[in-house]
């Protein structure tokens, strides 16, 4: 269980880091030359949702176990499924792989904390 909690913590921190990069430097993740105003807007919109969810996914399984922690981790996993689907739609293989890995880690931790 400790290894799974550590993996979940790393996954949550990675998700937070990518959200912060997406908010601060959206072109770094979208690989566009100069981000448009809309791209910057959506980068910040993504970060304002992903950072709190990532922090909650990091803290919840460490603070308590049970249905509440499992539900929160399931929500984090669902968000990563969405990110993976966006990766599939845009053929961004690193996004597919990263989001799929984070989905698996959050899901496994959710099952283990019930």
Regions found by a protein language model. Give the residues of each.
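Helix-coil boundary and interhelical linker segments in multi-pass alpha-helical membrane proteins
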Residues: 1-6, 59-68, 108-114
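Small-residue-rich segments of transmembrane alpha-helices in multi-pass membrane proteins
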Residues: 40-48, 99-114
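Membrane-helix boundary connector in multi-pass membrane proteins
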Residues: 63-64, 71, 82-96, 114
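Hydrophobic alpha-helical segments of small multi-pass membrane proteins
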Residues: 73-84, 98-110
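Membrane-water interface at the C-terminal end of transmembrane alpha helices
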Residues: 18-22, 85, 89-90, 105-114
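N-terminal signal-anchor/start-transfer transmembrane helix
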Residues: 5-30
């Amino acid at each position: 269980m400790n290894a799974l909690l550590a993996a979940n913590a790393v996954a949550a921190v990675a998700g937070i880091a990518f959200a912060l990069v997406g908010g601060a430097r959206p072109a770094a993740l979208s690989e566009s030359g100069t981000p448009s105003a809309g791209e910057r807007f959506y980068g910040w919109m993504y970060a304002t949702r992903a950072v709190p969810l990532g922090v909650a996914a990091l803290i919840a399984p460490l603070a308590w176990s049970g249905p509440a922690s499992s539900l929160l981790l399931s929500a984090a996993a669902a968000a990563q499924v969405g990110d993976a689907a966006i990766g599939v739609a845009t053929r961004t293989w690193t996004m597919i792989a990263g989001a799929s890995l984070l989905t698996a880690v959050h899901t496994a931790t959710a099952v283990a904390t019930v």
